[in-house]
Amino acid sequence: MASDAQGQRENADAICSNVFNRGGSGLDSAVAGGQESFEGVERLLKVNPYVSLAKKGDDWGQQKFKFCGRPPAAQPDHAQALRAFRGFIEPFRQILNPLLVNLVGKRKDEACAYSSLTLYWTVILGFFQHLRSRNQMDMLRNTRAYSQTVLELSGQPYDTDDTELHTACSQTCRNFLAQVDATALELVLVQLVRYLIRSKWFRDAMLYGCICVAVDGTLCERKRGSHLSSKEKRRYVLEARIVTPWGWNIPLLSEAVEAYDGDKEKQDCEYKAFVRLAKRLKELFPKQAFCIIGDALYCCRPIMDICRKNNWDFILTFKEGTMPKVYRAVQLAKQRTKSFSWMTAKDPSGGVKSAGIVSWVNAMECAYELGDGEDFRVVTYFSWGATEDGGAYSGCFATSFEVTEENRALNIAAWGRRRWNIETGFRVEKHGGFGLEHTFCNDDTAGRNYHLLMQIAYTLWQVFDTGVLSRLSDRCRKTSQEMWAKLLFIAILILGLSSVPHVTAGAMRMRRYHLVA
């Protein structure tokens, strides 16, 4: 073909004539000339001949690394964490396994591949490792080391040469938990707490001889189903937890807040749930001295009367809206009695400055305003600067303890503020990997039992974190609790608990010297 018929192209197969292949117009020179272009993965794998480096080599002229400065911090060791877990969990196995082995529901263990203990420990270990859902518990459950770990914890015999060794799936655990009596399973949690009490774990967390129990309600989980109303979808529970100065909130008892009754058109409430919970708590611990700590919802005469009837003390948040008449009388009595003390703090120059005020009044002194007295004391705490007890805060507390001087008033205020430990616990369980508010199943019994096993795992984790991980974290203080849980999960997947016999691990010494009020 003649060149004029080819659009002045010398090559009939060329994409663009040389006339247009300049000045930035037209196609790229590589494409116009039939050259291969470097795009995507090819650009990464092949050297572009059109790019030249001033200095060839992989160092690009950088100087050789030479360490200087202070040595880096130690990294957490997953094998050491597994060894510590082995020594920690053994005494708790001896407490839990005899109690759980008889809770078999309607199944026959001899006809099943997994024993009831194996199913319990499958769920407890999943919660302990912060695997917040059934999908995460199923993710890597069939690895050999993980399966051996679950069987080691439950004590179920197994063949070490079995090539088909695996762990039960979450659906098997769910079907089993749907048949177990939740009341009987809750007694296992109670026995675990009794073991901690007998072991003197709360010796330094007692207020005038009383173990402090905070009560509060929380959303447990949400049921699925388009046929359910918004009120029926939510499962609420009232929790009673032992709180300590070092941040523990150990689950003790829980009482379900009944779902909305459409026939009676009535909704259960925390107050009615507390009446039921207090009755069970007194039956389970008839001689134990407790101090009930609650928010303003519980600051009313019926709750105080229940505490007095059970020989319990109380510290309740006192607000104007709960007992308006008494609140106004207390304010007048404070002006008349003038029982108060200034709180001080050191300023940057080394001097002393006022940082707050604490006052107290016996509600019996309100008889002048009310005509009759109230059998409790009121402590008011107000700080506008940093003090030994924390930063700025304003609060008022009603208590059954005698308050006659500043130190007792400050102590009452400090324990009243520790009610927030239970709120912190709820937040950790919701967002820290335990799965509170996550829907594990729609069955009421199984959901209740999942919640109880979560509380057992959360109790064990708090003791493990404070008594064991605090030792391991001395040189790697930036490792969070959730990261330790992941490291333990990795160690169990790779090594397994069978790689650390209890005889060689020994009993892990607990660190207790910092558990001081």
Q: Positions of the model-derived regions?
A:
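Conserved, well-structured functional cores that handle cations and Mg-NTP chemistry
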Residues: Q94-P98, R107-L316, S480
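An anionic, glycine-rich sequence signature occurring as long contiguous blocks
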Residues: D313-N421
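A C-terminal functional module that forms or caps the active site or interfaces directly
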Residues: F397-V403, A409-M454
